[in-house]
Each structure stands twice: as C-alpha cells, then as structure tokens.
C-alpha cells in the first residue's frame, strides 16, 4: 500500500498503483459472472466465422496479399481491443456518474487518466481468452503467417493497444460532455469495422472515407501488424505506419486531456460533480 508520504515523494509510483488497482478491480467485476467469461470468445468467434464464410463464398483466397483468415485474424484482434476499450475506458467517467461515485473519482487524489486507462487494461485482461480462441479458429481455417521481424510485430501490436486506449481516453470526456455517450458509443461499434480496416482493406473503401480511416490510430496499427505478421515486413518497412499510429494516438491523448479538464472545470464551476 502507498502511504500519503510516498504519494508525495513518488508520484509515479502512485499513478502506477492507481492504474494497476483500477485494472485489477475492474477485471474482478467483469469476472463475477460466468457469462462474462464466455461472451467475448463466442461473440468474436462468430464474427470471425461470418466474415470468413462470406469471403469464402465470394471466392476470395487472399486479401491485400495475405490469407483471408490471417487478414481477418488481425482485424479480430483489433475488434477485440476496440470493443473492450470503448465500453471500459470510454465509459469510465460515465459509469462513475451512473453509479453515483463521480464525487469520489473527482475529489480523490487518484490520477483520473490512470483510472480511465486502468478500466481499459482490466477489460483487455478479461478479453485475453478471446484472443486465443479466435487465433485457433483462424489457424484451423487456413491463416498463414510470415514473420521476419518479431520486434516490428511487437511494436505494431503495442501500437494497436496504445491506439485503442488513447481513443478510449479521448472518448471518456467527450461522452460526458456530449450528454449522449451511450448513443455515440453504439453508433461507433459497426462503422469501426470498416473505417479501421478490420474486415476490408482501407484501399477498397471510397476515397472520401479514407481520410476518416487515417484519422484513427488503430487503422495504422492494424495495417502495420498485418504487414509484419503476415507479409514479412521489417521494422524499417512498417515503421511509417507504426509511427503514424503513435502520432495519431498522441493527438487523441491531447484531446482526452483537454476534454477531461473541461469536465472538471465545468463541474467545479457549477459546484457539483453530477452536472452531466
């Protein structure tokens, strides 16, 4: 346990404790009911199988130079991470408001960005079985890998996680400020499959849609992960996409920071934390 003295002397340790504590607590909450443990693997496997069958029926054996199952596997990874982040980090403040704990969140010395990210990490930990189940199904259905540079693949996967967490952090404040967080979150679920290139290559989307795709960090991360894990790209070759992912993610972090500050400012000015 970190004492108040240690908190003052070691703020990094305090933030780390808040991050891990939040992630652990949210994981325990999600793991309470058995249905929560099997929902993600079943849902994501059905989603993968649906798209795999659809591509098979149209006679496609490759997508963007990669096997259909391999392409969809990377998209499923992105889908798992995005789905977990959207309903955890994105709804962190909204959940606290709904549960009546927003006062504790805003008045405590805990770092609110760490709380928001902690929710996302807890949800990702809960979704871990889904990664393995979908990966097994993908391999059995013909996924082929060509990994030359493990470091490049690791950086791409790290970018996928960081990019989705950055989106969740940005959405946390935006959902509150919009006063219609649930509606926005629901609207974002399906379009992201296409905008981020999870189920179809970005190059096949209409030209006017592609700028919106490039504005998402997960788009660049998914492309980089496919390049490194399926096409044998090295760090140098996939570097532009990896850098683009982290660069766009940084912009989302800035947006999240100012939107969170706005929520705090308005709440303090009004003298109540349940303003929204």
Residue positions per predicted region:
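Hydrophobic transmembrane alpha-helices and immediately adjacent juxtamembrane helices
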Residues: 1-276
């Amino acid at each position: 346990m970190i004492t108040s003295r240690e908190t003052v002397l070691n703020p990094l340790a305090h933030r780390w404790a808040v991050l891990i504590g939040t992630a652990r607590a949210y994981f325990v909450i999600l793991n309470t009911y058995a249905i929560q443990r099997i929902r993600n693997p079943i849902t994501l496997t059905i989603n993968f199988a649906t798209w795999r069958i659809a591509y098979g029926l149209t006679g496609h054996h490759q997508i963007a130079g990669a096997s259909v199952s391999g392409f969809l596997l990377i998209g499923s990874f992105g889908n798992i991470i995005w789905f977990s982040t959207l309903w955890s980090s994105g709804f962190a403040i909204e959940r606290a408001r709904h549960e009546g704990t927003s006062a504790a969140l805003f008045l405590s010395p805990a770092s609110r960005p760490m709380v928001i990210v902690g929710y996302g990490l807890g949800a990702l930990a809960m979704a871990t079985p889904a990664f393995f189940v979908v990966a097994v199904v993908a391999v059995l259905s013909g996924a082929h890998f060509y990994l030359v540079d493990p470091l490049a693949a690791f950086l791409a996967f790290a970018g996928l996680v960081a990019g989705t967490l950055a989106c969740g952090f940005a959405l946390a404040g935006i959902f509150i400020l919009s006063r219609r967080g649930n509606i926005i979150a629901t609207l974002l679920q399906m379009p992201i499959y296409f905008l981020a290139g999870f189920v179809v290559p970005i190059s096949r989307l209409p030209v006017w849609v592609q700028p919106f795709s490039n504005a998402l960090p997960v788009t660049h991360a998914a492309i980089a992960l496919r390049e490194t894990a399926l096409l044998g790209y090295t760090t140098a070759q996939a570097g532009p996409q990896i850098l683009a992912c982290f660069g766009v993610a940084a912009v989302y972090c800035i947006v999240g920071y100012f939107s969170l500050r706005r929520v705090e400012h308005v709440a303090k000015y009004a003298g109540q934390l349940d303003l929204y």
